[in-house]
Amino acid sequence: LINKGIPGIGICLGMQLLLEYGYEGGIKTKGLNLFEGDVKILPKFRKAKIPNIGWSDTVLSRNEEYWQKHLNNAFYYVHSYFVKLSNQEEKLATINYAEQLNINVAIYKNKLLGVQFHPEKSQRQGLELIRDYFQFHI
């Protein structure tokens, strides 16, 4: 379906599965290879707790009106891993993790959106993102 341009959203682990490889449990595992890059465990910083749980403001990487409307918000996160993209043009948004590392939290290409946060737990802005994404792309 993805190769036919049908829109989709990968949420949290779903986003991570879109990449080439992941290292959950320290074992290199193949992903769906729809985005170039891999998934790494969050680094241990003094100010950081793993898993990263709670609300964080996104920082947009693209200045497009659609993404400004839908990703320029705070969203709810529960994760221990982060996506490291090879192609930075696919990056939509980041958050600043532990005041030390900007990590990718939204990626996009060919009508496929990946988000590290949980839009279904992110109140109105998360539900609007899901609803409007499919209305816009269908």
How would you label these PLM feature ranges?
Residues N3, G37-I138:
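Amide-donor transfer/coupling interface in amidating biosynthetic enzymes
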Residues L1-N52:
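Cysteine-nucleophile active-site neighborhood
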